Amino acid sequence: MRRATITRKTAETDISVEIDLDGTGVYDNRTGVGFFDHMLDQLSRHALIDMTVRCDGDLHIDDHHTVEDVGIALGQALAEAVGDKRGIVRYGSCLLPMDDALVRAALDISGRPYLVWDVALPTAKIGTFDTELVREFFQALATHGGLTLHVTRLAGINSHHIAEAAFKSVARALRAALETDPRKANAIPSTKGSL
């Protein structure tokens, strides 16, 4: 069973995350940040990861702690659920169009966290959501999930479309990387023998 439950409580946020990597993309995400919930829903649906996220954050200050800390907890849950990575494909990529936006994501569930982010968002806000928080989320997810993650905007003029294409492309890349390879069901996908 590739599942995990993570709770994380600080002076800034109180978070619970439950995921099932072998799900169907069922989600119930409530962080108090509407646009972010919409993006988490996309991540769940397109990665086929069942996901429940609850966050009570210091939104009276701003959305930063909520978004970053959910990324931390979700990354921790991903790392726990995938375990020793035995039998997974490991690599995934996706080139995803959404209207004017075209975003490419490529990732390696390597245990070596690294983010390369080349996604310019033309506006500072999407509604009330600070667009710089999109990168903050993926930095936290990559760091705590042990992902090498490259995300690149190839086209786009609408910030909402670009951000959503980023979440969807990462989701599709995750979906591919998390698949189990029936030919290597008990093998670690590395010549080193561990990841």
Swiss-Prot record:
It holds the Pfam family IGPD. It comes from the Bacteria. Its EC number is 4.2.1.19. It catalyses: D-erythro-1-(imidazol-4-yl)glycerol 3-phosphate = 3-(imidazol-4-yl)-2-oxopropyl phosphate + H2O. One of its GO terms (biological process) is L-histidine biosynthetic process. The keyword Zinc-finger does not apply. One of its GO terms (cellular component) is cytoplasm. Gene3D superfamilies: Imidazole glycerol phosphate dehydratase, domain 1 (3.30.230.40). Keywords: Amino-acid biosynthesis, Cytoplasm, Histidine biosynthesis, Lyase. GO terms for molecular function: imidazoleglycerol-phosphate dehydratase activity. Pathway: Amino-acid biosynthesis; L-histidine biosynthesis; L-histidine from 5-phospho-alpha-D-ribose 1-diphosphate: step 6/9. Its main location: cytoplasm. It is found in: Cytoplasm. Disulfide bonds: none annotated. HAMAP family: HisB. PANTHER family: IMIDAZOLEGLYCEROL-PHOSPHATE DEHYDRATASE, IMIDAZOLEGLYCEROL-PHOSPHATE DEHYDRATASE HIS7. Belongs to the imidazoleglycerol-phosphate dehydratase family. This is Imidazoleglycerol-phosphate dehydratase. It comes from Dinoroseobacter shibae (strain DSM 16493 / NCIMB 14021 / DFL 12). The lineage of its organism: Bacteria, Pseudomonadati, Pseudomonadota, Alphaproteobacteria, Rhodobacterales. The gene is hisB.
